[in-house]
Curated annotation (Swiss-Prot):
Principal location listed in the UniProt entry: cytoplasm
Record organism: Shewanella halifaxensis (strain HAW-EB4)
Single Gene Ontology MF annotation: GTPase activity
Protein name: Urease accessory protein UreG
GO CC terms, sorted: cytoplasm
Family the entry assigns: Belongs to the SIMIBI class G3E GTPase family. UreG subfamily.
Domain of life: Bacteria
Assembly notes: Homodimer. UreD, UreF and UreG form a complex that acts as a GTP-hydrolysis-dependent molecular chaperone, activating the urease apoprotein by helping to assemble the nickel containing metallocenter of UreC. The UreE protein probably delivers the nickel.
Length: 207
């Protein structure tokens, strides 16, 4: 591989509302995958690089494997209509680490209608959390219905917010038939092995 050549990594878009646990998920995934694969992360924040700093402080990856993009304005635009800043960040990481296997692209906090441009993400993971209420899956939206994997996070909070995981499970099955979803708790690691299996299988990393 010459200096100008580099591997095209698998690009995984990670979206979801503010506070749903996207950054915590990325920390867990990076730590679980980094000894097996070459990993990097692009984070999106409107005016800061806070999520990039959080991942760096948590030592999820070396600092040169994390790029924080300051999107300004609407975070949806940076992952959909004009993904140029994110595409440039992915390319920069791929050039910097020529054998990258995976680049995670974390969106800024978005709503249920946000989607990743197919030019930017090969696979999409959408994260919602139980604290938003059991009605979230049935509200639908592209994040719920079209993502390759839906993660329903913070299941430990269900008793405190009056959310029924049974109802959420039924609604999710109805809203995304045939598409996978996983109930998770990042604090205990519940659901993490299933997420890793999905990434390796759907991303064809283990071929």
């Amino acid at each position: 591989m010459t200096e100008l050549e580099y591997k095209q990594p698998l690009r995984i878009g990670v979206g979801g509302p503010v506070g749903s646990g996207k950054t915590a998920l990325l920390e867990v995934l990076c730590k679980a995958l980094r000894n097996k694969y070459q990993i990097a992360v692009v984070t999106n924040d409107i005016y800061t690089q806070e999520d990039a700093k959080i991942l760096t402080r948590a030592e999820a990856l070396d600092a040169d494997r994390i790029i924080g993009v300051e999107t300004g304005g609407c975070p949806h635009t940076a992952i959909r209509e004009d993904a140029s800043m994110n595409l440039a960040a992915v390319e920069e990481l791929a050039k910097r680490h020529k054998n990258l296997d995976v680049v995670f692209v974390e969106s800024g906090g978005d709503n249920l209608s946000a989607t990743f441009s197919p030019e930017l993400a090969d696979l999409t993971i959408y994260v919602i959390d139980v604290a938003e209420g059991e009605k979230i899956p049935r509200k639908g939206g592209p994040g719920i219905t079209r993502s390759d994997l839906l993660i329903i996070n913070k299941i430990d909070l269900a008793p405190y917010v009056g959310a029924s995981l049974v109802v959420m499970d039924q609604d999710t099955k109805r809203m995304r038939p045939e598409k996978p979803y996983i109930f998770t708790n990042m604090k205990t690691g519940k659901g993490v092995p299933e997420i890793l299996t999905f990434i390796e299988t759907a991303g064809m990393l283990n071929i």
